[in-house]
Amino acid sequence: MDEMIRRAIDESIAEVAVATGSDIYLVEADVRGGGRIIELTIEADKGVSIDQCAKLSRTIRARLEACEENLMLAAGDFELMVSSPGIGEPIRVSRQYLRHLGRKMKVVYLDSEGERKEIEGKLTEASLEGEEPSITIEPVVKGKKKKTSGREPLTLRLADVVKAVVQTEW
């Protein structure tokens, strides 16, 4: 990603976080077409509102259009999309686990032999500090009533997590 675009994104997120009193952070940035298409996914520990996405979009656009060293950006000749992660999107940044404590998740991980395994259960803990960040999943039995499975909670090192997706509960 172009250094100038990245700087504009980072500075804008910091500005909007202060202005809205939130803790928004960047989950993913996808810049394609030589900077003509910029897609950002943002998150906050307590969720992201449409107003925050719109404010961030306006702030980034203004910063990029004020950039005289890139004529394409200065002319506003680019597409900018700012959104929050949708339902069923995998966790991309470890900080997202904090937002989903208490929710049901499906986690694909590597066991001690390096084999892929899957567990579905409630995220009960997220320890993101220290040398080995980890999450703890309490397995649940599939069925009409959500019950614990009788299996012990499983603590996984984040380094072993291949994919984690929050499950919707209807």
From Swiss-Prot:
Major subcellular site: cytoplasm
Any single biological process term in GO: translation
Isomerase among keywords: no
Gene that produces this protein: rimP
Protein name: Ribosome maturation factor RimP
Pfam family name, one: RimP_N
Function according to Swiss-Prot or TrEMBL: Required for maturation of 30S ribosomal subunits.
Transmembrane as UniProt keyword: no
Annotated localization: Cytoplasm
Keywords: Cytoplasm, Ribosome biogenesis
GO cellular component: cytosol
Entry's family note: Belongs to the RimP family.
